[in-house]
């Protein structure tokens, strides 16, 4: 009897066993966690803060809301949401990577943000919450690292409350050819060098560049969100499409 072929997926440009991807992504983020915030500022020239500000402005978050900041890493979005939901609300910073959670927890504690934030290690494909739990779910620069994106989107849909929204902030496809070529040169030449100099890890930043190119484009992700059940799904290109902010609702 022949064995069932092993399912494969991509890890950057490499083809790997589906069951191996999560641990390989974990190794990347264990490696970069300590320098993650510094590298974000360097890589984006600080523009990531504007992208996140736009995400917060699109969130509709109010006092008393329950928010899941999925793949929340070092907690930039969680910090702001904690202030917006107030004492009667709750923010959960969720991440599959323990090193990223540790850095995020320490950073937010140092900012004095305690009381309405919980930290949970979780897999986006099987979120450990009851149905209809959250008013808002955000996933910023995390979806491209998920092995089964469709499964993760269905899991997010399940735990959103009716009327709740999902915001996906992610690298995407530049709108113009000239920008795309310049972005490719930067990503594949300068980014790994920066990673080597600052984080002593060029390979992780090579993976970062490759994972961005393998991520679904704007319209494909919009369709994936609709297929998962989301309605009124739209996206907004930021910085010429280098990043896109997708939004969908559950009714």
Curated annotation (Swiss-Prot):
Pathways involved: Quinol/quinone metabolism; menaquinone biosynthesis; menaquinol from 1,4-dihydroxy-2-naphthoate: step 2/2; Cofactor biosynthesis; ubiquinone biosynthesis
Gene3D superfamilies: Vaccinia Virus protein VP39
Superkingdom, natural source: Bacteria
Top-tier EC class: transferase
Pfam families in the cross-refs: Ubie_methyltran
UniProt-listed Enzyme Commission number(s): 2.1.1.163, 2.1.1.201
Binding site for S-adenosyl-L-methionine: 74, 95, 123-124
A biological-process GO annotation: methylation
Keywords: Menaquinone biosynthesis, Methyltransferase, S-adenosyl-L-methionine, Transferase, Ubiquinone biosynthesis
GO molecular function: 2-methoxy-6-polyprenyl-1,4-benzoquinol methyltransferase activity; demethylmenaquinone methyltransferase activity
Reactions the enzyme catalyzes: a 2-demethylmenaquinol + S-adenosyl-L-methionine = a menaquinol + S-adenosyl-L-homocysteine + H(+); a 2-methoxy-6-(all-trans-polyprenyl)benzene-1,4-diol + S-adenosyl-L-methionine = a 5-methoxy-2-methyl-3-(all-trans-polyprenyl)benzene-1,4-diol + S-adenosyl-L-homocysteine + H(+)
Keyword S-adenosyl-L-methionine annotated: yes
Function: Methyltransferase required for the conversion of demethylmenaquinol (DMKH2) to menaquinol (MKH2) and the conversion of 2-polyprenyl-6-methoxy-1,4-benzoquinol (DDMQH2) to 2-polyprenyl-3-methyl-6-methoxy-1,4-benzoquinol (DMQH2).
Family statement drawn from the similarity comment of this UniProt entry: Belongs to the class I-like SAM-binding methyltransferase superfamily. MenG/UbiE family.
HAMAP family given in the database record: MenG_UbiE_methyltr (MF_01813)
Protein name per UniProt: Ubiquinone/menaquinone biosynthesis C-methyltransferase UbiE
Species: Pseudoalteromonas translucida (strain TAC 125)
């Amino acid at each position: 009897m022949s064995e069932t072929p092993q399912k494969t997926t991509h890890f950057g440009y490499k083809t790997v066993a589906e069951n191996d991807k999560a641990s390989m992504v974990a190794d990347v983020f264990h490696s970069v966690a300590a320098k993650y915030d510094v590298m974000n500022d360097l890589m984006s020239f600080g523009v990531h803060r504007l992208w996140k500000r736009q995400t917060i402005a699109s969130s509709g978050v109010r006092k008393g809301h329950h928010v899941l900041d999925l793949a929340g890493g070092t907690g930039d979005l969680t910090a702001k949401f904690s202030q917006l939901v107030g004492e009667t609300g709750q923010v959960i910073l969720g991440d599959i990577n323990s090193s990223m959670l540790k850095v995020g927890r320490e950073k937010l504690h140092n900012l004095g943000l305690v009381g309405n934030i919980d930290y949970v290690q979780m897999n986006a494909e099987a979120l450990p919450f009851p149905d209809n739990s959250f008013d808002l779910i955000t996933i910023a620069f995390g979806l491209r690292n998920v092995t089964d994106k469709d499964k993760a989107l269905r899991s997010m849909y399940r735990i959103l409350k009716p009327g709740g929204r999902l915001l996906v902030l992610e690298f995407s496809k530049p709108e113009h050819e000239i920008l795309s070529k310049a972005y490719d040169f930067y990503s594949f030449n300068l980014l790994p060098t920066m990673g080597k100099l600052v984080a002593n890890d060029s390979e992780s930043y090579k993976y970062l560049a490759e994972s961005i190119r393998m991520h679904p484009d704007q319209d494909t992700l919009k369709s994936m969100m609709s297929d998962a059940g989301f309605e009124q799904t739209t996206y907004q290109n930021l910085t010429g499409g280098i990043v896109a902010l997708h939004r969908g609702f559950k009714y």
